[in-house]
Amino acid sequence: MKVNDMFWFWLILGIIALFIIVKAIVIVNQYEGGLIFRLGRVIGKLKPGINIIIPFLDVPVKVDMRTRVTDIPPQEMITKDNAVVKVDAVVYYRVIDVEKAILEVEDYEYAIINLAQTTLRAIIGSMELDEVLNKREYINSKLLEILDRETDAWGVRIEKVEVKEIDPPEDIKNAMAQQMKAERLKRAAILEAEGEKPE
């Protein structure tokens, strides 16, 4: 072999070796967890720091274990007394069991959103409009209780649920605005009358 050929041989061999070494190293952050799959089977867990795997045979799957926030998109729901309200919420959750989160559900965030929507629809459907507008804390606690129980099988803990907005029908909004205006006018008249009283 010529010197030039030897140079290219060792260069290509070095590049291949470097590529394999880079592929063999998996860095996991402190806030992550994960599993190592070899030919489709779980063979171990990823730990924070540097993990060594066999390239092309092992597949690392990482999961963020910090608290995450996801919006539940606004949707129209029907109350027990057939009023239509638009409700949206936000869910705070975190993965507590990496193995369940990876193996038991395909996409836990998507599953949480769908579960929250159907659960919220059921809760709102069991209440009358007046209750829905006045019992936001009850709705939050009921939704949290049900979601946390159901997502336990996925290795997810629901930490907090907040209903952001409950938007009543237009006719109800108009009636509420008129009532508030009437109350302001009444207070103003009382204050004005008290100001005119002789001492």
UniProtKB/Swiss-Prot annotation:
InterPro entries: Band-7_stomatin-like (IPR043202), Band_7 (IPR001107), Band_7/SPFH_dom_sf (IPR036013), Band_7/stomatin-like_CS (IPR018080), Stomatin_HflK_fam (IPR001972)
Location of the protein in the cell: Membrane
Source organism superkingdom: Archaea
GO cellular component: plasma membrane
Transmembrane segments: 7-27
SMART domains: PHB (SM00244)
Main location: membrane
Keyword terms of this UniProt record: Membrane, Transmembrane, Transmembrane helix
Disulfide bonds: none
Membrane topology qualifier: Single-pass membrane protein
Record family assignment: Belongs to the band 7/mec-2 family.
Name the record gives this protein: Uncharacterized protein MJ0827
Organism field: Methanocaldococcus jannaschii (strain ATCC 43067 / DSM 2661 / JAL-1 / JCM 10045 / NBRC 100440)
